[in-house]
């Protein structure tokens, strides 16, 4: 995957995520398909929470010359939390942070992409490898969101609610 491919994939994740979930209401965001499945809200929270961590990791490596970082912790924060703010606000923040990251990446030359960073759990990797890992991870979650949202149960029409008269009749 080239640098152009990586930047394109990273820039497309917020928009693709928004396209898939803009229509979800609170009940659908919290719906759990089964005990082993995350809710759509927790998947979205996971993507939204990782964006500033990935952005910070890349900025510190680029601007501060940081050579050690926990890449996995930035890419894959906890899945346990649900979405704690309105969906639209979370998606807008995700897009804003990702635009900032992509703007940074557009300015990188070969030396920057080839700069290595040491991850205590993953060993040495280039910043291009880090971005490839982020892109693959996020695209996997986009596919997961697509699949889970396609499998949501259809809302049921329980019929017209009648007016209750005196004594509940």
Label the model's feature ranges:
Residues 23, 46-47, 107:
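Conserved catalytic core of Hanks-type protein kinase domains
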Residues 7-11, 15, 28-74, 116-169:
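Short, contiguous alpha-helical
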Residues 2-6:
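Short Lys/Arg-rich basic patches
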Residues 10, 76-115, 129-134:
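Acidic/histidine-rich alpha-helical segments that form the ligand environment
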């Amino acid at each position: 995957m080239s640098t152009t491919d990586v930047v394109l994939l990273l820039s497309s994740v917020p928009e693709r995520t928004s396209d898939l979930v803009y229509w979800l209401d609170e009940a659908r965001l919290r719906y759990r398909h089964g005990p082993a499945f995350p809710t759509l809200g927790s998947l979205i929270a996971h993507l939204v929470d990782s964006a500033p961590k990935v952005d910070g990791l890349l900025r510190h490596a680029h601007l501060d010359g940081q050579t050690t970082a926990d890449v996995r912790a930035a890419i894959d924060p906890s899945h346990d939390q649900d979405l704690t703010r309105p969906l639209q606000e979370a998606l807008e923040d995700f897009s804003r942070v990702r635009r900032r990251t992509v703007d940074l990446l557009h300015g990188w030359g070969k030396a920057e992409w080839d700069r290595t960073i040491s991850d205590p759990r993953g060993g040495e990797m280039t910043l291009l490898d880090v971005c490839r890992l982020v892109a693959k991870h996020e695209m996997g979650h986009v596919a997961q969101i697509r699949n889970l949202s396609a499998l949501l149960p259809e809302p049921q029409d329980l019929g017209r609610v009648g007016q209750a008269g005196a004594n509940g009749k």
